[in-house]
Amino acid sequence: MPPDLQGRTEQGSEEERRVDRWKRHDWWGVVLDAPDVAVLARFYSELRGWPIWKEDEEGAALDLGEGVAYLGIQRNPDYVRPVWPAATGRQQMMMHLDFEVIDLEAEIARAMKLGAELPEHQPQEGVRVLLDPAGHPFCLYT
């Protein structure tokens, strides 16, 4: 364990641990670029049930509920939507998010109702690649 994290065992009730985590200084996150922060923040908030912790027109952070991780959305007016599947000479995805689900078909339908797209190209069974409203690929799997 890194020295700066030693002794940071979380004790107390769930509520005490949740409040205490906001005092920590070892946060890390994944940040997605988007032309419209609000649209993408609301999509992931509704998809995963993560509250929007901070939001303004330049960015947002979603509270994942445990630990010290967050999902960030930052406005990028020059954002170029990636293509899926990847194509030479075209904007490539930089990364993607994976979410394990219990009922794959139900979660695909729910994601699409929230604004996701289901592309024709699907590389494997038990996993579905979808595109969020900004075009970022993400996977749902069982």
Language model regions located:
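A generic local structural motif
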Residues: R17-R18, P82-P85, G115
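Conserved Rossmann-like nucleotide-cofactor binding loop
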Residues: I102, H136
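N-terminal beta-strand motif that seeds the catalytic metal site of vicinal oxygen chelate
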Residues: P2-R42, M94-V101, Y141
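Core segments of cupin and vicinal oxygen chelate
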Residues: D20-R75, E107-A109, K113-H121, E125-V129
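Long, low-complexity, intrinsically disordered polar/charged segments
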Residues: F43-E46, V80-V101
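Conserved short beta-strand elements that form part of the metal-binding/catalytic scaffold
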Residues: D4, P51-Q91, P137-T142
